[in-house]
Amino acid sequence: MEKDIYDTLKGLVANRVFPDFAPVDTPRPYITWQQVGGKVINTLANTTPDKKNAVVQVNVWADTRASANPLALQVEAALRTSSLFVAMPEAAFVGSYDADVPVYGTRQDFSIWSAR
């Protein structure tokens, strides 16, 4: 799933897609993501399922709110329409701002079903 997320989003930000966090000197905009949970599939036959689920938080980071929000919508569209997995937003994105950097961001959780 990790490679599939990268492959789905890399074209939006010139390959600047990172699990967990980006290097400090990464040019903006960029995307980070991390798994924050998911559903477990249990079978009565005690077998390993061929699918897995992850709730993935996707973060967009940009220099301005005016550039972060449209990119967040592009991320949502790219994940929803990916042929590599099935992704469904859990809710709309939430805006954020880190005054220490400073950087504008969004975060949105997606339930992603993929091959195991």
Name every feature range the model reports, one short phrase each.
Residues 52-56, 66-73, 93-98:
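Low-complexity, flexible helical/coil segments
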Residues 77-116:
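Acidic-leaning, charged glycine-interspersed low-complexity segments
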Residues 1-46, 66, 70-77, 82, ...:
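Small/polar-rich, solvent-exposed N-terminal microdomains that initiate assembly or binding
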Residues 49, 61-67, 87-92:
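Short C-terminal domain-edge/linker segments immediately following a structured domain
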Residues 50-63, 104-115:
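Oligomerization/assembly interface segments of phage tail-like spikes and tubes
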